[in-house]
């Protein structure tokens, strides 16, 4: 996964919103990566949701990533899997997938991000950058300054996550993030389509202003 020409807007599904309703709206707004994250869902339900959502992503030219479950990603021919620090190791997932699938890794330090890169990750999810209520965290927000350090150290794209809104997204791109991952900023919005469109516009404007 090379550094993309367009900023990455990864919309992660939540437990409270129907992805079958939200995802098509987010895609219409310009989201170019969808991550299916349903911690309480059975394998059967995840397969059902993935098979329903993948056609929307294919039509929109967006990537479809499964959170945690490499087996579901393989079974449904998703574009890839996103792995946390307590999930299947990145190196093992790369052996399982070969070169044809995308592997993302959740990281919260430059060392974790570099390790993920060495082990075959295609991108590093990096955060949480700002305070967030979407997921319980046992450490303080890293702050936007950490983006600069991590982006300078990595060859793979870095996707910032955690408490990101339209008010704070632009500076993260300025500091070297290839994109952002959001949950509530889109899933809880009155219009997921407009929320996604606004976030993508902010990132594109920031990049254009830097001549990249």
Curated annotation (Swiss-Prot):
S-S bonds: none
Keyword ATP-binding: no
Protein family according to the UniProt entry: Belongs to the thiamine-phosphate synthase family.
Any one GO MF annotation of this record: magnesium ion binding
Source organism of this protein record: Chlorobium luteolum (strain DSM 273 / BCRC 81028 / 2530)
Pathway: Cofactor biosynthesis; thiamine diphosphate biosynthesis; thiamine phosphate from 4-amino-2-methyl-5-diphosphomethylpyrimidine and 4-methyl-5-(2-phosphoethyl)-thiazole: step 1/1
Domain of life (superkingdom): Bacteria
UniProt record, GO biological process: thiamine biosynthetic process; thiamine diphosphate biosynthetic process
Enzyme Commission numbers on file: 2.5.1.3
Name of the protein: Thiamine-phosphate synthase
A Pfam family per the record: TMP-TENI
Protein purpose: Condenses 4-methyl-5-(beta-hydroxyethyl)thiazole monophosphate (THZ-P) and 2-methyl-4-amino-5-hydroxymethyl pyrimidine pyrophosphate (HMP-PP) to form thiamine monophosphate (TMP).
Binding site residues for 4-amino-2-methyl-5-(diphosphooxymethyl)pyrimidine: 35-39, 67, 106, 135
Keyword Transferase tagged: yes
NCBIfam families cross-referenced by the UniProt entry: thiE (TIGR00693)
Manner of cofactor binding, per the entry note: Binds 1 Mg(2+) ion per subunit.
Keyword tags: Magnesium, Metal-binding, Thiamine biosynthesis, Transferase
Cofactors that this protein relies on: Mg(2+)
Gene Ontology annotations for the cellular component aspect, listed alphabetically: cytoplasm
SUPFAM superfamilies per record: Thiamin phosphate synthase (SSF51391)
Coiled-coil annotated spans: none
The reaction(s) this protein catalyses: 2-[(2R,5Z)-2-carboxy-4-methylthiazol-5(2H)-ylidene]ethyl phosphate + 4-amino-2-methyl-5-(diphosphooxymethyl)pyrimidine + 2 H(+) = thiamine phosphate + CO2 + diphosphate; 2-(2-carboxy-4-methylthiazol-5-yl)ethyl phosphate + 4-amino-2-methyl-5-(diphosphooxymethyl)pyrimidine + 2 H(+) = thiamine phosphate + CO2 + diphosphate; 4-methyl-5-(2-phosphooxyethyl)-thiazole + 4-amino-2-methyl-5-(diphosphooxymethyl)pyrimidine + H(+) = thiamine phosphate + diphosphate
Family matches, as InterPro entries: Aldolase_TIM (IPR013785), ThiamineP_synth_sf (IPR036206), ThiamineP_synth_TenI (IPR022998), TMP_synthase (IPR034291)
Residues binding Mg(2+): 68, 87
Binding site for 2-[(2R,5Z)-2-carboxy-4-methylthiazol-5(2H)-ylidene]ethyl phosphate: 132-134, 163, 183-184
């Amino acid at each position: 996964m090379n550094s993309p020409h367009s900023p990455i807007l990864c919309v992660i599904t939540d437990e409270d919103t129907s992805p079958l309703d939200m995802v098509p709206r987010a895609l219409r707004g310009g989201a170019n990566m969808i991550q299916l994250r349903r911690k309480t869902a059975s394998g059967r339900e995840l397969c059902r949701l993935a098979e329903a959502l993948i056609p929307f992503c294919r039509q929109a030219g967006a990537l479809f990533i499964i959170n945690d479950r490499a087996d579901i990603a393989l079974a449904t021919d998703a574009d890839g899997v996103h792995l946390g620090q307590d999930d299947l190791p990145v190196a093992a997932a790369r052996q399982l997938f070969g070169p044809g699938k995308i592997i993302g890794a959740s990281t919260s330090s430059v060392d974790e991000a570099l390790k993920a890169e060495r082990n075959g990750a295609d991108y590093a999810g990096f955060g949480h950058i700002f305070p967030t209520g979407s997921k319980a965290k046992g450490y303080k927000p890293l702050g936007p300054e950490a983006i600069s350090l991590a982006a300078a150290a990595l060859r793979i794209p870095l996707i910032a996550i955690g408490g990101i809104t339209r008010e704070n997204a632009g500076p993260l791109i300025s500091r070297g993030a290839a994109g952002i991952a959001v949950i509530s900023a889109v899933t809880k919005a009155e219009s997921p389509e407009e929320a996604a469109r606004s976030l993508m516009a902010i990132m594109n404007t920031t990049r254009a202003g830097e001549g990249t």
